[in-house]
A protein has these predicted regions:
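A domain-start/cap signature at the N-terminus of enzymes
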Residues: 1-22, 48
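Serine-hydrolase catalytic machinery in alpha/beta-hydrolase-like enzymes
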Residues: 20-99
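Alpha/beta-hydrolase-fold catalytic nucleophile elbow
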Residues: 54, 110-112, 135-136, 163
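Active-site loop->helix "elbow" adjoining a glycine-rich segment at hydrolase catalytic centers
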Residues: 84, 113-116
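Alpha/beta-hydrolase fold nucleophile elbow
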Residues: 100-112
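Residue in the alpha/beta-hydrolase core beta-strand immediately N-terminal to the catalytic nucleophile
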Residues: 107-108, 131-133
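Short glycine-enriched nucleophile-adjacent loop
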Residues: 116-126
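The feature captures the conserved acid-bearing segment of alpha/beta-hydrolase catalytic domains
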Residues: 136-183
Length: 183
């Protein structure tokens, strides 16, 4: 693992041994990168590089618009996703990818809760990511992102990884990958 800081964010890089592995950017609330990477390895996931970003202002960095608090006695969401996306694309990604071996065969973004919302939002704002994982998007937000995901002509679902199908969905393939890594 390699750790660095940029723009007040802590970036932890868990590198793949290969030179053309996919790279996944995971925004975390409590610095869970190590646990996620270890769980993926324990589940025999194909090799990948994980870049976990922590020290986020969760209710600001992950949300595209202002919104009232989700729960009692919590802060409102203040719509800073565009600013954070600029930091991610102009600072974090170039810095992280200088630290790995080779060139990633594809780049993905993942997140849970509000970071899941950010992951979905980001694929409509930049073409840097060809894969997205969203876990438990916040239902309290009234947002246009949900309809955009299912209605946007350039962002139709093209595949679900065979490993995800087999271990999580317990279902046969419904989508076929358009691109594969060499490994």
């Amino acid at each position: 693992m390699y750790t660095l800081t940029t723009s007040g964010k802590t970036i932890s890089i868990f590198s793949c041994a290969g030179s053309e592995c996919p790279i996944i950017y995971l925004n975390t609330f409590s610095n869970e990168g190590q646990k996620v990477f270890e769980a993926a390895q324990a589940a025999s996931c194909p090799p990948f590089t994980l870049v976990a970003i922590s020290d986020l202002d969760w209710n600001h960095d992950m949300v595209p618009w202002d919104s009232p608090p989700a729960f009692k006695n919590t802060d409102p969401c203040t719509g800073g996703a565009d600013d954070y996306l600029r930091i991610l694309t102009e600072e974090i990604i170039p810095t992280a990818e200088k630290k790995i071996t080779g060139v990633p065969c594809w780049r993905g973004i993942a997140g849970y809760s509000l970071a899941g919302l950010f992951a979905l939002y980001s694929i409509y704002q930049t073409d840097l990511f060809s894969r997205v994982v969203r876990v438990a998007i916040q239902n309290f937000l009234k947002n246009p992102v949900i309809s955009m995901v299912f209605g946007h002509p350039n962002r139709k679902i093209s595949c679900i990884s065979p490993h995800f199908r087999a271990t999580v969905l317990k279902q046969p393939p419904f989508f076929t990958p358009k691109t594969k890594c060499a490994n």
